[in-house]
């Protein structure tokens, strides 16, 4: 497919600021989870790429307080990159990670166990929870997180709500 960007040179030609290129993670070490690779395998090339991204963000984009990671295709590693970057950034800044993929939540898929009911972005938008009830601390870190919440299938009901406009 000629519309897919496959090289750093192709990215450079777009004149869009970039904060890094991640190496493909072919195989995880036994007992490691990709969402915590930055913590669990700090010596990996993946973790080094995350640290480089953090350094670029802190130097080039110091005025920005919000960052969004997105792409047009599923399963490209957006959540993996964003979550590991948040784990890195929380070492030097206060960070709130918001998992906004309400249709396909990843962060909670049995990975973290919280000591209370999970309320998330879906519940905030639907009006069944407020912001403070939906913020969780990631165990073992200072990272705050708002998960997607319960898995949602009827997005049209949620997106049409007045709460999303707020």
Where are these regions (language model features)?
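Short boundary/hinge segments that flank catalytic cores
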Residues: 1-96, 100-122, 128, 137, ...
